Every structure is written in structure tokens, then in C-alpha cells.
Amino acid sequence: MILDVIVEDKLKRLPEHKKRISEEEMTRLAIESQRVSHSFYDALAKDGLSIISEFKKASPSHGNMNNKITLEKRIKQYGESADAISCLTEEDHFKGSTEYLKQIRQMTDLPIIRKDFIIDPYQVYEAKVIGADAVLLIAAILDDSRFKELYDLAYSLGLDVLCEVHNEEEMQRMLNLDVKIIGINNRNLKTFEVDLDTTKKLADMVTPEMRKAGKLLVSESGVADTDDIKVLAKSGADALLIGTVLMEAPKPEELISEFKEVYNAERK
């Protein structure tokens, strides 16, 4: 399964990172950091639909992005209408880099989430140091004990956590852990097939009381056009994380505005 391969490759990559900057040094840099995070949670909690625009060079399901626009221009475009930015830092399958996130941090005050396959505390400390405001934790690759360890560490460093699920079992685990932000991935990371109904099916497990208490839902993956937006509008998600269609759009800022308009109209 592709997910297993990605995690195996990540395990091989980690020693390279730790060789460049030791675990002790990375921990010290993160703890001593004076950087105040931009609230990822607040960006998603505001009225109306929030959109997390993703920067990535490639993906296993799509291949290389059809995009010759520079990083600087793309982030400037995102900044006109997006609410947060997701940056892929996974090297082998998404052609990401921590350097991209560092550069994006210098270009925008929007909250940035480090999107990677995080399995080690080092990666959380590293996220803080390179300028991230939040990290992605994927339920499918972490048991509850490890998940809670990384989750608590992130919040202790002032980082928000997007907790990703794909099925009922993973959703129930996150509800049991009482996490703040749940990301429902419409793409099965084991087969890479997409089903937009996944968001509504899993969102129905979150009670109105939980929503009133502040639990946020993000729908991830699979958006290609306004028809998809209309489907997801029925799910009740607070935010959408959108990657490929925005990366390949010549004017993503206009597409983001259109998506928000359609979504909010459907919700009325």
C-alpha cells in the first residue's frame, strides 16, 4: 500500500534531518523560539467557509503539478482570498521541502500548516522552528499513545493540530481523544480513491454539542469544481483544504472566491 511505502521512506529520511540538526539542538531551538504563531484554529473558526490553499509540487495520485508559476507569485495569489496555507514538506512522493515552508513564512502572515507524515517528535519541533503554525497528524499511521504524545507536544509549542481521519474507526478515536480540529480526508490514503460523501458520513458522527463546544471540521481532498463544492456544502464542514485544482489554476484567488460564494450560498 502506498501509505506504508510513504511511512517507510519517511523513517529513512528522518536520520538525514537529525544529522543536519541534532534532536537536542532542534528541541532547544523550538522551545526557545520567540515566534508567536498565527492561529490556524481562528482562521477556520470564523463565519462562512474558510479555505486552506495548498502548495505542493506533486502527489502520488496526480504526478507533477502542471504549474510554472513561481512560489512567490502563487503565495501572493493565495493571500488575496485564502484563509490559511498548507505546505507539503514530504520529499519523496510530494516533492516537498522544509525550505518551501521557510520561504512561505517570509511571504505571508496567513497561518501555515506543515503537511507531512509526522511520526516523530523531531518533526513537530522542526515545524515550529521552520515557521509553521500548525501540523497535520494522520490517525492511520499513529496509535493513540503516539498520537496523543505528538498532539500534546504541538500544543505545548503553540502549534495547532489538524487531526486527519478517513473512516468511522479513526473518527471515533479522535472524538475519544477530544481533539479540536478534525480533517476528514475524502481520499483513501491506502488506495488513493476519492469519495466526497466521506465528509458527510463522518461529520454526522460529530454531535451538535461538540460543534457548539468549538470542534471544527475540515474536508480534505477531491475538490475539482463548483459541483464538488455543492456536494461538500451539505456536509457542514467549517473549512476545505484544496490542493491540485488551486495549484494548477492560473488565477487561484478568483477560484477560491468563487468556491466560497457557492458554498455559502448552498448553506443558506
Swiss-Prot record:
One GO molecular-function entry: indole-3-glycerol-phosphate synthase activity
Gene Ontology BP terms: L-tryptophan biosynthetic process
CDD domains for the chain: IGPS
InterPro entries found in the cross-reference section: Aldolase_TIM, Indole-3-glycerol_P_synth, Indole-3-glycerol_P_synth_dom, Indole-3-GlycerolPSynthase_CS, RibuloseP-bd_barrel
Entry EC number(s): 4.1.1.48
Keywords linked to the UniProt accession: Amino-acid biosynthesis, Aromatic amino acid biosynthesis, Decarboxylase, Lyase, Tryptophan biosynthesis
Pfam families reported in the protein's UniProt record: IGPS
Catalytic activity line of the entry: 1-(2-carboxyphenylamino)-1-deoxy-D-ribulose 5-phosphate + H(+) = (1S,2R)-1-C-(indol-3-yl)glycerol 3-phosphate + CO2 + H2O
Main enzyme class: lyase
Gene3D superfamilies linked to this entry: Aldolase class I (3.20.20.70)
Pathway info: Amino-acid biosynthesis; L-tryptophan biosynthesis; L-tryptophan from chorismate: step 4/5
HAMAP family named among the record's database cross-references: IGPS_B
Family: Belongs to the TrpC family.
UniProt xrefs under NCBIfam families: PRK00278.2-4
Name the UniProt record assigns to this protein: Indole-3-glycerol phosphate synthase
Source organism of the structure: Lachnospira eligens (strain ATCC 27750 / DSM 3376 / VPI C15-48 / C15-B4) (Eubacterium eligens)
This protein's encoding gene: trpC
